[in-house]
C-alpha cells in the first residue's frame, strides 16, 4: 500500500511533468525559469511571480529577480538568471512555472533533489544527444564509481565533467574532484545539480585541451569522454586529426601525478590505426587493468 509521502511525491511529479511539457521546446534555455524558482525557494527566498496587467491572471506574467525582491541574490541564482535572455522569465514560461509553483511549493524542499534529477532526466531523454547537455546514465555512473572508489584516490580530475555524475555519487562523497566543462549551459545545470546534492565543487568552464588540470595534485583521471570528437592539432598531419579520447589518454600516459584512470571511451579507441602508438604504450607500461565492453544501447 502506498504511504502518504510516496503519494505526495507521485502527485508532485505528475504536476512537474505538466509544467515540463509546457516548457520544453528545442533547448535547455526554456527550463531556466523553473530552475531559478526552485533554487530560490530552496534557498529560502520569497519567490514573486507577478502579472504585468491589472490583475495576476490578465496580462503577461513575470518572474521577478530575487535581487529586487530580497535585495540579495546568491551566485548560483545570478548564474541561472544571466545564462539566458530575460524574455524566458516572462510570458508563457512564467505562467507554466507559476502553475506548478502555486500548487506544489509546500513540498519542494522535501523532494528538492528528486525534482532536479527528474527535470534533468526528462529533458535529456526527450532531447537525446542533441540536447547539448551531457549526462552519464545512472548505471554507467555507478559502475565507473565502483572502479574509481577501488582506486582509492585522494583527488580526481574529470576533464569532460558534463553534469558531474561521478562527483554526486554517495560512495565518492569524501573524494575531492577537479572538473572542467566546455559548455556554459551544461556548467550551469551541473552547478544546480551539485547544489541539490549538497556537494561543494567548483566547475571550471574551459577547454581541457588548452588548460589541462590533471597535474593539479590529482592522482586519478575519471571521465566519460565525448565519442569521436576531433581536435585541430597543428603538430599532426591535418589529414589525421587527433581525437579527444586519444588526447586524454596521451595526457594520462605523460602525467607524473596520475596513477590511475577510469575512462569511458568509444569501442574504436581499441582498434583505430592512428592511435596504435598510444595503445602500444599503455600495454608496454602495463597501465591496463581491464577493458570492459558495454552492451549496445547502454
Which ranges hold each PLM region?
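Non-catalytic accessory regions of SAM-dependent methyltransferases
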Residues: 1-52, 266
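Generic structural signal for well-ordered alpha-helical scaffold segments
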Residues: 20, 145-149, 253
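Long recognition/docking surfaces used for binding and targeting
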Residues: 34-127
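Conserved phosphate-coordination/catalytic loops
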Residues: 134-139, 239-246
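Switch/connector loops and helix/strand junctions flanking conserved nucleotide-binding motifs
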Residues: 229-232, 272-273
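Glycine/threonine-rich flexible loop motifs
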Residues: 232-238
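Conserved Class I SAM-dependent methyltransferase catalytic core
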Residues: 241-297
Amino acid at each position: 500500500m502506498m504511504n502518504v509521502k510516496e503519494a505526495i511525491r507521485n502527485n508532485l511529479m505528475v504536476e512537474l511533468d505538466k509544467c515540463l511539457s509546457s516548457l520544453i521546446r528545442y533547448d535547455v534555455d526554456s527550463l531556466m525559469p523553473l530552475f531559478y524558482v526552485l533554487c530560490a525557494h530552496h534557498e529560502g527566498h520569497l519567490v514573486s511571480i507577478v502579472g504585468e496587467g491589472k490583475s495576476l491572471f490578465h496580462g503577461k506574467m513575470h518572474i521577478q529577480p530575487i535581487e529586487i525582491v530580497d535585495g540579495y541574490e546568491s551566485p548560483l541564482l545570478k548564474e541561472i538568471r544571466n545564462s539566458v535572455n530575460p524574455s524566458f522569465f516572462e510570458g508563457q514560461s512564467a505562467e507554466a512555472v507559476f502553475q506548478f509553483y502555486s500548487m506544489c511549493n509546500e513540498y519542494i524542499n522535501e523532494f528538492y533533489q528528486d525534482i532536479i534529477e527528474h527535470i534533468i532526466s526528462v529533458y535529456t531523454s526527450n532531447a537525446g544527444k542533441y540536447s547539448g547537455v551531457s549526462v552519464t546514465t545512472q548505471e554507467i555512473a555507478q559502475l565507473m564509481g565502483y572502479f574509481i572508489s577501488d582506486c582509492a584516490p585522494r583527488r580526481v580530475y574529470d576533464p569532460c565533467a558534463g553534469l558531474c555524475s561521478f562527483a554526486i555519487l554517495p560512495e565518492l562523497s569524501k573524494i575531492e574532484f577537479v572538473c572542467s566543462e566546455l559548455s556554459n549551459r551544461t556548467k550551469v545545470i551541473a552547478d544546480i545539480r551539485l547544489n541539490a546534492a549538497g556537494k561543494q565543487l567548483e566547475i571550471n568552464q574551459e577547454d581541457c585541451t588548452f588548460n589541462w588540470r590533471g597535474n593539479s595534485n590529482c592522482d586519478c583521471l575519471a571521465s566519460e569522454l565525448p565519442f569521436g570528437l576531433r581536435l585541430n592539432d597543428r603538430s599532426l598531419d591535418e589529414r589525421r586529426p587527433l581525437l579527444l579520447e586519444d588526447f586524454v589518454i596521451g595526457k594520462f600516459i605523460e602525467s607524473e601525478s596520475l596513477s590511475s584512470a577510469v575512462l569511458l571511451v568509444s569501442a574504436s579507441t581499441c582498434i583505430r590505426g592512428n592511435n596504435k602508438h598510444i595503445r602500444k604504450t599503455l600495454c608496454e607500461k602495463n597501465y591496463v587493468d581491464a577493458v570492459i565492453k558495454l552492451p549496445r544501447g547502454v
